[in-house]
UniProtKB/Swiss-Prot annotation:
The keyword tRNA-binding does not apply. The N-terminus is blocked. Residues 1-24 form the signal peptide. Pfam families: Glyco_hydro_17 (PF00332). This is Glucan endo-1,3-beta-glucosidase, acidic isoform PR-Q'. Keywords: Apoplast, Glycosidase, Hydrolase, Plant defense, Pyrrolidone carboxylic acid, Secreted, Signal. It is found in: Secreted, Extracellular space, Apoplast. Belongs to the glycosyl hydrolase 17 family. The lineage of its organism: Eukaryota, Viridiplantae, Streptophyta, Embryophyta, Tracheophyta. Coiled coil: none annotated. Induction: Accumulates following infection.
Amino acid sequence: MAHLIVTLLLLSVLTLATLDFTGAQAGVCYGRQGNGLPSPADVVSLCNRNNIRRMRIYDPDQPTLEALRGSNIELMLGVPNPDLENVAASQANADTWVQNNVRNYGNVKFRYIAVGNEVSPLNENSKYVPVLLNAMRNIQTAISGAGLGNQIKVSTAIETGLTTDTSPPSNGRFKDDVRQFIEPIINFLVTNRAPLLVNLYPYFAIANNADIKLEYALFTSSEVVVNDNGRGYRNLFDAILDATYSALEKASGSSLEIVVSESGWPSAGAGQLTSIDNARTYNNNLISHVKGGSPKRPSGPIETYVFALFDEDQKDPEIEKHFGLFSANMQPKYQISFN
């Protein structure tokens, strides 16, 4: 009996260690809107060589899903915005989508289904607002019907522009004109114990506000910049994240976790802010920082996906072409470590 107890304790310790290790891993966003990009099989090899254990893709690209078979890379799979109307229209359509893109790939480690990206009443994706929640519900029903409800969580990725009054972070709330949109989504996530996916970019905050110090955005400030009722903020990433947590709390979403589904820094495209040095500093500090928590949620880690794996020269505007960590020849644009 004593031997059995010792064995069980060792297994428990190993399991906890494994969970902590995987939880601390930053992933990458793998977009394909670029010329001359490597094959999906080569991309998977690149990720393995660089200790990248999580990936976000924005659509169910079959060659990519094939390349991920047996790879041990955990996947966030997107339902693209143009597909939302179809999967929202009927349960049968959603069942077919899940069968074709999830169930047919039983040896791919699906972690999340991101139903829609940056759908909002306030941007160019507003036409998808009426169908988003029903699309999420239908995909959830299909995932649950496949017996995968505990393994794969269904959510959607929002932009931080849905929040306001974000300084200090404890004042953060959702804008009045998005509450009717976001609150039913929050209720859905609470019911299904799924995280909210948030695309979080200190770069765009500082690009639109000259009063923000660069050190605060790059995680290099040596002192507290914002003091919020005893919580000290040395970086903008934590401030934006915790403002979003405050907004969730005010919308009956205090039980939710946030997964940062995109964050990155461009290396060119818009003047002095967009330099190789700034991109290297931000992304390396981001990967290190998210192994811990934020002032509001200090236990951490903060599951985060770095945008993006490659430059994508088919995207617009110009700034969107330059977020890549690697060049098309799979050489790092600058020194980057996921260890």
